[in-house]
Amino acid sequence: VSATFADQESAYLAGVAAAKTTKTDHVGFIGGIASDIITAFQVGFQEGVKSVNPNIKVDVQYAGSFSDAGKGKTIASAMYSGGADIIYQAAGGVGTGVFTEARVLNETKNEADKVWVIGVDRDQESEGDFKSKDGKESNFVLASTLKEVGNVVKDVSNKTKDNKFPGGEILKYDLKNSGVALARNNTSDEAWKAVETAK
């Protein structure tokens, strides 16, 4: 049995949250290695942003790696200094560098001026803690797109219990059957309302 996740659906919601949060009308997407799976994250994110405001600029860059954290840091640095204030990363270990860059940058800013990162595959909020220049304990993870692997395991074991083990089938998990989701993390009430509506 194999499972596929409709990552573009949770990425779309991340795009809505980003578009409702950006102060610069400029956001970014960093992918690992271009493939159908990662492109689905990118396109979903872009569509979500566009649904809120088609004039928001979305920078897109691929690292050509899933492990090069240094590359992630360099790309994030260029995007942030180019005016993007939120980056969604779907890039494995490359994403670690994006978090590092956001932390370094945010420690030089007042809390109100922080830049954001959107987490991927699991809730990454705990990786976004920092102390701002004006001495505030804060967090820069706006939201996280989730693969709800636990729900999939539950679903397959329930099917098995009912003698309906889906051997050889490809099971598709999306927002409707709770296979993917968006963790709210630090999304504002207004932005979260837009996410709920977009669902």
Predicted segments, located by residue:
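A residue-level marker of the well-folded mature domains of exported/periplasmic proteins
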Residues: 1-199
